[in-house]
């Protein structure tokens, strides 16, 4: 399994993706991984999604008479004709701070002192806050079923557009039982769907949790190869341990 990473904003509108698909196929890749294609929030970050059921307007082909969703479906169909399958980033650990979800379902999010909190990380002993993000509280929300059903609808929406799999962003931050149910129920309807888990920066126990949840691959890192703007995702089996990715 060889994965070619196509970054949407570098590739341009959906109608411009076919030459990249052809180049990837000619180099022997069989999967294309694209970063998030849904509508981003005020920061513009592709990983800060404001609306999961709208596509990024920057990817519209102004010369096309098709809707944006139709353009994407046609583009993914072109990949299939070249023998390629396309996976997309599934970002359900967090969303954009300016998403309507924060007002419609505040109980879905991690809160601090009665307010929805921004996620953060520690870097060199300093707290780095992602001010454009809010984190879903998958383990402890009072409406776990509602949040789960919403995530299921996101996956189904992306599959109906023509994607064949997912690179699940920050997968280790979502409980394995939730992933296990989601993967199982999606595969009941879409049996060939590929789920890969991002495990970069997580502990060994967290990696084990993703393996037990039903992920077929874990994506540990990206490696830049000797071509401008081409990124190859290093993916290894979840059953492998203490392996370096090349």
Locate the predicted segments by residue:
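Substrate-binding/active-site clefts of carbohydrate-active enzymes
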Residues: 1-13, 18-19, 23, 27-29, ...
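Hydrophobic faces of well-ordered beta-strands that scaffold small-molecule active sites
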Residues: 2-6, 32-34, 86-88, 166, ...
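Glycine-rich nucleotide phosphate-binding loop and flanking beta-alpha elements
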Residues: 40, 94, 166, 174, ...
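Active-site-proximal helices and loops of the catalytic beta/alpha 8
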Residues: 76, 153-156, 169-246
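Conserved, well-ordered alpha-helix/loop/beta-strand core segments that scaffold catalytic motifs
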Residues: 161-167
């Amino acid at each position: 399994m060889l994965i070619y990473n196509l970054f949407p904003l570098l590739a341009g509108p959906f109608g411009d993706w076919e030459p990249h698909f052809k180049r990837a196929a000619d180099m022997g890749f069989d999967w294309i991984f694209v970063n998030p294609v849904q509508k981003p929030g005020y920061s513009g970050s592709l990983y800060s999604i404001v609306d999961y059921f709208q596509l990024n307007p920057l990817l519209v082909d102004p010369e096309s008479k098709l809707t944006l969703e139709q353009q994407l479906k046609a583009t993914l169909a072109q990949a299939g004709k070249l023998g390629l399958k396309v996976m997309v980033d599934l970002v359900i650990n967090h969303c954009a701070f300016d998403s309507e979800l924060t007002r419609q379902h505040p109980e879905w999010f991690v809160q601090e002192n009665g307010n929805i909190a921004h996620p953060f990380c520690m870097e060199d002993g300093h707290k780095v806050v992602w001010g454009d993000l809010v984190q879903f509280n998958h383990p402890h929300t009072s409406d776990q079923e509602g949040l789960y059903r919403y995530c299921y609808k996101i996956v189904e929406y992306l599959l109906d557009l023509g994607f064949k799999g997912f690179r699940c962003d920050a997968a280790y931050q979502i409980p394995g039982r939730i992933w296990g149910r989601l993967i199982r129920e999606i595969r009941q309807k879409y049996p060939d769907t590929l789920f890969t888990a991002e495990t970069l920066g997580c502990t060994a126990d967290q990696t084990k949790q993703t393996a037990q949840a039903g992920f077929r691959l874990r994506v540990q890192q990206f490696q830049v190869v000797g071509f401008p703007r081409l990124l190859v995702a290093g993916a290894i089996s979840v059953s492998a341990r203490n392996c370096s990715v090349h």
